[in-house]
């Protein structure tokens, strides 16, 4: 399996996990934040999609993020700016998805764009340097660290939150 195939397969698994995250949840459960320092399932979904959009569209391709170009903030009732990194617990608790259907449309669009971008690459392209704030890293390292590993961690966080509410995890018996 090539590196790109591995990335595509892993991101597809992560996408399926986030698609299933709200299944069977009430609005209250979707926005439940346990005591202490944590996030809601809604926050995890929003953050993951925004990060994926930011990296695949803006950082890797120099294009406007789908969030802005598609007018998704107005459709979903979510903030126009920000993506959750460095956000205080208080601000994270304010993330509220008012239209789950619209938000899932955004999730699907971001997933399509990400997989299309990966499909346009060859192994050599993964060696290209990409500029982040204070440093550069290879495209392959950036995809693995900021998308594959980071987003899969939040997918696991969703399952923990579901378990805290007495619900089954997403993708049970599939490496959930």
Regions found by a protein language model. Give the residues of each.
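A structural signal for long alpha-helical coiled-coils and helix-turn connectors
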Residues: 22, 26, 119-122, 162
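N-terminal export signals and maturation junctions of secreted/periplasmic proteins
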Residues: 1-5
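Short alpha-helical scaffold segments that flank and stabilize functional sites
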Residues: 24, 51-55, 117
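Hydrophobic alpha-helical core bundles mediating ligand binding, dimerization, or RNAP-core interactions
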Residues: 11, 15-18, 22, 107-114
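Acidic/histidine-rich alpha-helical segments that form the ligand environment
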Residues: 78-128, 145-147
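Short, contiguous alpha-helical
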Residues: 8-12, 19, 29-85, 129-176
């Amino acid at each position: 399996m090539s590196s790109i195939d591995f990335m595509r397969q892993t991101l597809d698994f992560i996408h399926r996990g986030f698609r299933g995250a709200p299944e069977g949840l009430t609005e209250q459960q979707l926005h439940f934040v346990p005591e202490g320092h944590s996030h809601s399932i809604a926050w995890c979904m929003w953050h993951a999609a925004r990060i994926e959009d930011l990296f695949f569209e803006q950082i890797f391709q120099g294009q406007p993020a789908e969030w802005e170009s598609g007018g998704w903030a107005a459709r979903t009732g979510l903030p126009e700016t920000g993506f959750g990194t460095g956000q205080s617990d208080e601000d994270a608790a304010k993330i509220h998805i008012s239209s789950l259907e619209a938000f899932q449309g955004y999730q699907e669009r971001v997933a399509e764009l990400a997989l299309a971008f990966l499909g346009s690459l060859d192994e050599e392209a993964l060696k290209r340097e990409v500029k982040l704030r204070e440093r550069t890293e290879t495209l392959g390292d950036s995809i693995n660290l900021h998308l594959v590993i980071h987003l899969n961690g939040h997918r696991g966080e969703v399952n923990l939150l579901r378990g805290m509410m007495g619900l089954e995890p997403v993708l049970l018996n599939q490496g959930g």
